[in-house]
């Protein structure tokens, strides 16, 4: 997996096996109370300082949107209950491969070296669904990793054109409040 590739100890990894995803079909179910509780219990246990979710809310497959909802629904419940751990937590949305955030909306940008970008590609390729042509391309025939790399290159070029430092690539994030 991408976690082992990046030397993340498996006891730091949480595989949720959310019920909405386990349909055996292309179309996934809507999130359920069971999905929300699984994620909420993990958040309460870990009390993360940062959460990163896919912000491709209009991806051709639709799964990113459902996954994002499965994370934000329990966060919103925790907010309503005044969970103290949320005071130190930042929620960041990133884009996958279809489009980048508009520059005026980007709130954090992380530069990547050529080696880091290659590592990102290798992590993407650890997911069997990303190794070949994705079944939900939209209007873009490139492989997922190619689209993601091109997006990261373009973001770095845009920042450089604005007079900022030149990097191989950049990953942009928008904060969810």
Question: How would you describe each model-predicted region?
Answer:
Residues 19-24, 99-102, 116-118:
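A short acidic, often aromatic-flanked loop/helix-cap motif at beta-alpha or helix-coil junctions
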Residues 1-84, 122-125, 141-142, 172-173:
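Active-site beta-strand->loop->alpha-helix modules in alpha/beta enzyme cores, enriched
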Residues 1, 37, 96-98, 159:
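Residue-level detector of functional hotspots within protein domains
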Residues 14-18, 52-54, 89-103:
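Extended hydrophobic secondary-structure segments that form protein cores and membrane-embedded regions
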Residues 4-6, 28, 41, 80-92, ...:
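C-terminal accessory domains and tails appended to enzymatic cores
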